[in-house]
C-alpha cells in the first residue's frame, strides 16, 4: 500500500486536526477542492466534483491536510451527491463550530445532467 492510500485509509474524522483561531477579526476562509470523487450508490460509477468550502471561523480553523484527507475518504464510498455534501457540511459545522459556513459540490455532468448541491448555515427557504 502506498503512503497516500495508507493515510486516507487510516484517516479518522473523529481526530481531524483543527487549529485554534487566534485572529481578533472576522474573516472568511475559502478552500477549493477540485478533485472530489465518490461512487454512485446505484451504479458504482465514479462521480467527480469540485467542492467549494467557505466559512467564517470562530474558535477553530481546519488544518489543510486534514480537509484534503477527509475529502479523499469519499473516493471509494457509495454515496449520493446530496448525501456527500450534507455529510461534509455537517462534519465541518460540528467540528469547527464556525460563525458561518457554506459547502458547495459542483458535480461534473453525467448523462447530460449537471448537479450543484449547496448547504449553508444561513439558508433561507423562499
Curated annotation (Swiss-Prot):
It comes from the Bacteria. One of its GO terms (cellular component) is cytoplasm. Pfam families: QueF. One of its GO terms (molecular function) is preQ1 synthase activity. GO terms for biological process: queuosine biosynthetic process; tRNA modification. Its EC number is 1.7.1.13. It catalyses: 7-aminomethyl-7-carbaguanine + 2 NADP(+) = 7-cyano-7-deazaguanine + 2 NADPH + 3 H(+). Its main location: cytoplasm. Signal peptide: none annotated. It is found in: Cytoplasm. InterPro entries: GTP-CH-I_C/QueF, NADPH_dep_7-cyano-7-deazaG_red, QueF, QueF_type1. NCBIfam families: QueF-II. Catalyzes the NADPH-dependent reduction of 7-cyano-7-deazaguanine (preQ0) to 7-aminomethyl-7-deazaguanine (preQ1). This is NADPH-dependent 7-cyano-7-deazaguanine reductase. It comes from Campylobacter jejuni subsp. doylei (strain ATCC BAA-1458 / RM4099 / 269.97).
Amino acid at each position: 500500500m502506498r503512503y497516500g492510500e495508507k493515510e486516507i485509509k487510516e484517516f479518522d474524522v473523529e481526530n481531524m486536526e483543527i487549529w485554534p483561531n487566534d485572529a481578533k477579526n472576522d474573516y472568511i476562509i475559502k478552500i477549493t477542492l477540485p478533485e472530489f470523487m465518490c461512487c454512485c450508490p446505484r451504479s458504482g460509477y465514479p462521480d467527480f466534483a469540485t467542492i467549494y468550502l467557505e466559512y467564517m471561523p470562530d474558535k477553530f480553523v481546519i488544518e489543510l491536510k486534514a480537509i484534503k484527507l477527509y475529502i479523499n475518504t469519499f473516493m471509494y464510498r457509495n454515496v449520493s451527491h446530496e448525501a456527500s455534501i450534507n455529510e461534509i457540511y455537517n462534519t465541518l459545522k460540528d467540528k469547527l463550530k464556525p460563525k458561518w459556513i457554506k459547502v458547495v459540490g459542483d458535480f461534473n455532468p453525467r448523462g447530460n445532467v449537471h448537479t450543484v448541491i449547496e448547504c449553508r448555515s444561513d439558508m433561507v427557504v423562499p
